[in-house]
């Protein structure tokens, strides 16, 4: 059975890690390189770095931040934010990223998913979806959660897979930063529409929330930020709880 992954997320603005609630009210959490290294040593399976204002500010990814962070890591490293072209993708890979997360650029040009997958492989392409409940469905948002697109999240995830995405990074905007639990209904809905791994994001607060999203949400991985940055949970302790609940995880020897 495939191991479930625990992923630490670094939301970066102006070269610093920040974290807020529902995508607003951001507060400083530290240096990306230092925090990434600490999370890796603490037992995180992967690190995701998201340059959360690159698209909104119309600029590229902070490559020097990516380079310094990659130098601290010995586990898979995903980078997102400001990646609009194959050249952007190549530059981020050259700085040490293992995978790319694309969101707004893929909505503007869905062929970008196919182009990056054809050049670098599907395993290197993560389709990031920021979703918010709108009535009986979930709507996809772009530009760091600032703009609704009208796209249905389930349909967009399925299209992303067809175009070559190797994973879905699914963030519940309703739950983001609240520490009240993942949106298991949303996660399960997306997981049922695709055959590629789904990473659940938004709402982690307790170990039980992780158990819930793996068991009820059928997530392949779960991502968190606040609870790791501010010392609420230790990754290895969390993994021991998951293992005791019958969820397969990679434990430190």
From Swiss-Prot:
GO MF annotation terms: imidazoleglycerol-phosphate synthase activity; lyase activity
One GO cellular component term noted in the UniProt record for this chain: cytoplasm
Taxonomic lineage per UniProt? Bacteria, Pseudomonadati, Acidobacteriota, Terriglobia, Terriglobales
From the Swiss-Prot or TrEMBL record, give the protein name: Imidazole glycerol phosphate synthase subunit HisF
Q: What is its EC number?
A: 4.3.2.10
Q: Which organism is it from?
A: Koribacter versatilis (strain Ellin345)
Which family is it part of?
Belongs to the HisA/HisF family.
Q: What does this protein do?
A: IGPS catalyzes the conversion of PRFAR and glutamine to IGP, AICAR and glutamate. The HisF subunit catalyzes the cyclization activity that produces IGP and AICAR from PRFAR using the ammonia provided by the HisH subunit.
What PANTHER family is this protein classified in?
IMIDAZOLE GLYCEROL PHOSPHATE SYNTHASE HISHF, IMIDAZOLE GLYCEROL PHOSPHATE SYNTHASE SUBUNIT HISF/H IGP SYNTHASE SUBUNIT HISF/H
Q: Which reaction does it catalyse?
A: 5-[(5-phospho-1-deoxy-D-ribulos-1-ylimino)methylamino]-1-(5-phospho-beta-D-ribosyl)imidazole-4-carboxamide + L-glutamine = D-erythro-1-(imidazol-4-yl)glycerol 3-phosphate + 5-amino-1-(5-phospho-beta-D-ribosyl)imidazole-4-carboxamide + L-glutamate + H(+)
Q: Cite the active-site annotation.
A: 11, 130
What InterPro entries does the record tag this protein with? Aldolase_TIM (IPR013785), His_biosynth (IPR006062), HisF (IPR004651), IGPS_HisA/HisF (IPR050064), RibuloseP-bd_barrel (IPR011060)
Q: Which Pfam families match?
A: His_biosynth
From the UniProt record, give one GO term of the biological process aspect: L-histidine biosynthetic process
Q: In which pathway does it act?
A: Amino-acid biosynthesis; L-histidine biosynthesis; L-histidine from 5-phospho-alpha-D-ribose 1-diphosphate: step 5/9
User: Where is it localised?
Assistant: Cytoplasm
